[in-house]
Amino acid sequence: LKEVLNHWMGEGYAYTTVKKVYIVLNEYFRYLTQQEILTKNPMNSVPMIKKSNFMAAQNKEDLPTQETVTVFTPEEIEKFKAEAFSKFSNGKSKYQQPAAYLLMLNTGLRTGELLGLLNSDINLEGRYLEVRQNVKEVCRREGTDYVPGREVKVGKTKTATSKRRVPLNEAAAQAVRELRQERDFGPTAPLVSDEKGDYTRPVNFRKRYYRILKAAGIEQKGLHSLRHPNVKPKTHIFYI
């Protein structure tokens, strides 16, 4: 039964949907035990996974409702930028690929879309990039069975309309240049790659972002806050 719930979680079903399945199964087996068809309710040994863990397993953020509409103020953007590009006393950057967050801010890309960008998807001369794919983390599987651990999966964009051409302003173009200067594994490699030239794990990208927020003294905001100005037409866009 636990494998059934994990299956639906791994397939990307919403937490509320899986929880409803859990409740229905629990009620069903409770009825069977009351009718003495079963001696024990098997659901008693199958606890419902915590929402925070469930969301993390699906590469989603379990954030309070108010945070979903929180945007950066101009002052917060300056603080974020200062911390993101700060260096240690020896001159080494504190954070990897800080320009990636500026690229999100100036293009409205989703996290998975940004991490799925290949260098070949970007045309600096034409000042645009092509969103073609999406990166997410999923539970590992061996055949039809789930095994411990998670892996990066590259696939289609969230929706059909998500596959699009995005214009680049000067701030976004400069962010691309800085990312390539820091790490460039060629045209077929991800723009925001890990040290080996592979796709960056979304969880690592998020953790780095939250470390910057904390160090800069900015209240916690989801990564979607960086793209919020670009998906809400009436919201002022603060270019960095």
Model-derived features: where do they sit?
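Short, conserved phosphate-binding/catalytic loop or strand-edge motifs used
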Residues: L1-N6, I49-K51, V231
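Active-site/catalytic core of tyrosine-dependent DNA strand-transfer enzymes
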Residues: I77-E78, E137, T161, P167-E219
